[in-house]
Amino acid sequence: MNQTAVTTEIHAADVQLAQARISATIAPTPLQYCPRLSHLTGAEIYLKREHLQDVRSYKIRGAVNAISQLSDAQRAAGIVAASAGNHAQGVAFACRSMGIPGRIYVPAATPKQKRDRIKVHGGNMVELVVTGANFDEASAAAHDYAEETGATIIEPFAARDTIVGQGTVAAEILSQLSAMGKSPDTIVVPVGGGGLISGILSYLADMSPRTAVVGVEPAGAPSLNAALKAEKPVTLDAVDPFVDGAAVKRIGDINYQIIEKNLGRLHPLVVSEGAVCTEMIELYQNEGIIAEPAGALSVTALSELKLGTDDIVVCIISGGNNDLLRYAEVVERSLVHRGLKHYFLVNFPQEPGQLRSFLSDILGPDDDITLFEYLKRNNRETGTALIGLQLGRASDFDGLVERMNASRIDCRHLKPGTPEYEFVVS
């Protein structure tokens, strides 16, 4: 049974009812002033720390709001959901706390940490099914199951009750700032399928229409930007699954309808995955915040915004379900993004002393070899090595290339995003 709503009309009163409905289960999250980001931007930056929810994501709001309104018959028939991980945890939490059987579909790219947490939150009330290469394929499987069994689908973003539940984030932000005698000039929101941003836009339209909303997407999954250009939801050919909490091929239809009504206050923005990784590291090292990639989208956008010195800006840290095993890739992507990590295919003449020459004549004093793979071949004049270099400063790159060009050793830079780079390095 599909739960998609007939109307896109959502008002502050709907969100306030949802807030009362979920208050027994979900406690408000902190709104915390961030000195570092305030100093960097010149504005007054606050972090809405949704990663501190029981399931480490705001997604629990929409899930609990939707499930708590099911009829006895719907509860008995069970529920089904598809998710990249965070919505699934919210659904699992609600299933266990309300005693409702559930079946949850997640794509194969879902980090193990998120899968394990789904099992913890759902206990024996939830069955986890891993299927499909991305969210859209997992969602198709969930819809097929619902058609076969009569289970109710709890949509992760494209349903009215889910959107209304996510809108309670905005209600809390306004209330918390009001208690300080302040109101937000801008709220920066991560965007995947559009559930959070459409809920926030709906609430602000009634309660704070002057507040601007920045919608931030990863460059590898810009479904909202594609929809805005086409003036309707479109399906992307492919998405980069790295920012898994926002890796959605198509913005929700109902979500886009709400967004379209609020274009006057919306500022869409796309940021690179490398920039997201850099901010994930900054949040951890400075604020002690473990954010997942989607959770760092909002803060990553700050460097792209023109903010006034008196502006009050809220960034939503949407989730903190990050597998520590991913941090090696996070650091790698950040170094490449900042121009500190480079890869080269180097053809060494197969003569004694060539590696020594590379080290002494080409590398700078602060350059470090992080990868060296070489296979010596007989009856060949040259042998190829894959070399990874970490520079002391990004500005050292031009000098490195000049020394390579002046050398008799043939060096070819592998540029991120090219097929050669993806094949050899990734």
Question: Which stretches of residues belong to each language-model region?
Answer:
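PLP-dependent amino-acid enzyme catalytic core
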Residues: 1-426
